[in-house]
């Protein structure tokens, strides 16, 4: 049976998340959905999967149920299909932030960061500058192991291990951004939106976020100006520019991304180890995920 995978987020001030949590969990369980929904004072971040009938019912629920006071009435969802259920269980969690930066929570009511859509960005990259003739710099806001799976051509990559390091590396590298148009990007939009808001707040000019992230870019224009695939935080591991799962897998032991060629190594033992963590091996490391990372933890 085909499984529908949905991802969505929104920065919006929420005051009733403690009340919502058990009700949302009960509805998801009744529908037979699996995945993770994060609720925080600054908004919602969700990754869920299930049969088409169940996901359609959830979208109708989150957009129209009076419980949510219309806060998600026009919430956009990103959809992809898979042959199996990528999640093991259904979780609804309360968090301080929907994506952890360890800075004061953003104030959604003050407005979101400026954005650029996929087609406009492709046009900028095709011509080598934006509509004001400023050079365009692509800024990858993801963790280093995600970047290693694929990223935009010539993107800035500061090799962060977790998103909470982002403010410090931006402060240390402001000179890279001066006089340019900065387009922050991530998997699905949430990190690059928060990153763009932070840069705007600290006085960096001409900052945009890529609307909908890499996955929306793939959906709209394919893989133009992008090399590799896109890491995703579920059991598909990575998607190609056609939004199809790749042959990459995640090592059971160390969470490294193991591409197809590395799976042929005698050091790769499914469910046990890979070339990045095989005992006593000092060969080519895999693309290691953050220790303890969970599927559906961030986009």
UniProtKB/Swiss-Prot annotation:
Naturally occurring in which organism (per UniProt): Burkholderia pseudomallei (strain K96243)
EC number of this enzyme: 1.14.-.-
GO-annotated biological processes: tRNA modification
UniProt key word Phosphoprotein: no
A Pfam family this chain is assigned to: Rhodanese
UniProt GO MF annotations: oxidoreductase activity, acting on paired donors, with incorporation or reduction of molecular oxygen
NCBIfam families: PRK05320.1
All residue ranges annotated as the Rhodanese domain in the record: 132-226
Domain of life according to the entry: Bacteria
Active site: 186 (cysteine persulfide intermediate)
Family listed: Belongs to the TrhO family.
Gene3D superfamilies: 3.30.70.100, Rhodanese-like domain
Keywords on record: Oxidoreductase, tRNA processing
Catalytic reactions on record: uridine(34) in tRNA + AH2 + O2 = 5-hydroxyuridine(34) in tRNA + A + H2O
Protein name: tRNA uridine(34) hydroxylase
Function as written in the Swiss-Prot or TrEMBL entry: Catalyzes oxygen-dependent 5-hydroxyuridine (ho5U) modification at position 34 in tRNAs.
């Amino acid at each position: 049976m085909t499984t529908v995978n949905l991802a969505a987020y929104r920065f919006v001030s929420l005051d009733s998340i403690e009340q919502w949590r058990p009700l949302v969990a009960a509805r998801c369980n009744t529908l037979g959905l699996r995945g993770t929904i994060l609720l925080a004072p600054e908004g919602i971040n969700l990754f869920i999967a299930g049969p088409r009938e169940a996901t359609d019912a959830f979208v109708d629920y989150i957009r129209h149920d009076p419980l949510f006071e219309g806060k998600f009435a026009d919430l956009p969802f990103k959809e992809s299909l898979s042959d199996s259920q990528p999640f093991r269980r259904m979780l609804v969690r309360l968090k301080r932030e929907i994506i952890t930066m360890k800075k004061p929570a953003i104030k959604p009511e003050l407005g979101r960061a400026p954005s650029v859509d996929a087609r406009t960005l492709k046009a900028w990259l095709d011509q080598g500058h934006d509509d004001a003739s400023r050079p365009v710099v692509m800024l990858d806001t993801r963790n280093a192991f995600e970047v290693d799976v694929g990223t935009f051509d010539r993107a800035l990559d500061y090799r962060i291990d977790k998103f909470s390091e982002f403010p410090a590396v931006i402060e240390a590298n402001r000179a890279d951004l001066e006089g340019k148009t900065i387009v922050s990007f991530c998997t699905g939009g949430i990190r690059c939106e928060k990153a763009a808001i932070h840069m705007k707040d600290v006085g960096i000019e001409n900052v945009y976020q890529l609307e909908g992230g890499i996955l929306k870019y793939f959906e709209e224009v394919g893989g133009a100006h992008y090399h590799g695939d896109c890491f995703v935080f579920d059991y598909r591991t990575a998607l190609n520019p056609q939004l199809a799962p790749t042959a990459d897998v995640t090592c059971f032991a160390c969470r490294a991304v193991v591409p197809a060629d590395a799976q042929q190594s005698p050091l790769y033992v499914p469910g046990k180890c890979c070339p990045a963590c095989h005992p006593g091996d000092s060969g080519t490391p895999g693309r290691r995920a953050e220790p303890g990372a969970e599927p559906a933890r961030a986009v």
